[in-house]
């Protein structure tokens, strides 16, 4: 369990995200088709759908890792070109540099002195004692905690999570879900989570959307108290509704899921 060490005294809360008429294609295939989406500041939005529906592409466009073919993305009313450092993204692969220590991985790109900030971020994810270890000495769950600390040190107002827990075992996954939820509650940043796990989406999200072939086909507010009882009738009712829509989705075009 992570210690209650927080960077929140320097956090700026969540950012509002507004997407209008977003289009993106790869090699002649339309991946996003005029998608529009509004996410209020501080909301946790879960995004689910079959492989190839455009979920990861959407996050990469918000992170400015891909160019937009059409439409607009604004954060707090400002275009992405005017945003600096307020958006951070986590992937399924922690992407740690093997030749740098855990602490050095967290401090990459920061001006000196960065060590104290890095240690606070590491403490917040419960890994203070691993600061001087190499990434190869960590478990998969620990590596993802380091990746989370690396995002937190930049005090993001919008955190994008692209299947960060997908490769973890069931117990570690639950622990990471609890950690993400507790840190998000303290900092108040906005979160977009892409996941294939509908239960995870409902457990963490304030709202869930289902994507199909580059479009939003279902949108539900999750009006359940936290911490959520996954075995409750209300929880399973939402889960069944989302699962039914995902399972009835049309087959997605090939080639997008690697985007």
Curated annotation (Swiss-Prot):
ATP binds at residues 49-56. The keyword Membrane applies. It comes from the Bacteria. InterPro entries: AAA+_ATPase, ABC_transporter-like_ATP-bd, ABC_transporter-like_CS, ABC_transporter_ATP-bind, P-loop_NTPase. Residues 17-238 form the ABC transporter domain. Keywords: ATP-binding, Cell inner membrane, Cell membrane, Membrane, Nucleotide-binding, Plasmid, Translocase, Transport. This is Aliphatic sulfonates import ATP-binding protein SsuB 2. It comes from Agrobacterium fabrum (strain C58 / ATCC 33970). The lineage of its organism: Bacteria, Pseudomonadati, Pseudomonadota, Alphaproteobacteria, Hyphomicrobiales.
């Amino acid at each position: 369990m992570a210690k209650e060490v927080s960077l929140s005294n320097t956090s700026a809360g969540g950012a509002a995200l507004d997407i209008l008429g977003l289009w993106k294609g790869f090699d002649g295939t339309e991946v996003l088709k005029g998608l529009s989406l509004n996410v209020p500041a501080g909301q946790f939005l879960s995004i689910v759908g079959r492989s190839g529906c455009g979920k990861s592409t959407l996050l990469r466009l918000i992170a400015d890792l891909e160019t937009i073919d059409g439409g607009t993305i604004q954060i707090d009313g400002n275009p992405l070109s005017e945003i600096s450092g307020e958006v951070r993204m986590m992937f399924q692969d922690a992407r740690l540099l093997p030749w740098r220590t855990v602490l050095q991985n967290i401090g990459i790109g920061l001006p000196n002195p960065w060590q104290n900030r890095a240690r606070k971020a590491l403490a917040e994810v419960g890994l203070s004692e691993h600061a001087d270890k190499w990434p190869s000495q960590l478990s998969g769950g620990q590596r993802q905690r380091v990746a989370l600390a690396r995002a937190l040190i930049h005090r993001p107002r919008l955190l994008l999570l692209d299947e960060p827990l997908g490769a973890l075992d069931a117990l570690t996954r639950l622990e990471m879900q609890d950690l993400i939820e507790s840190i998000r509650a303290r900092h108040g940043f906005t979160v977009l989570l892409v996941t294939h796990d509908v239960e995870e989406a409902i457990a963490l999200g304030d709202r869930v959307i289902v994507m199909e072939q580059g479009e939003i086909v279902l949108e539900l507010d999750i009006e359940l108290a936290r911490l959520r009882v996954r075995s409750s009738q209300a929880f399973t009712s939402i889960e069944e509704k989302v699962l039914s829509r995902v399972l009835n989705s049309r087959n997605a075009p090939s080639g997008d899921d690697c985007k």
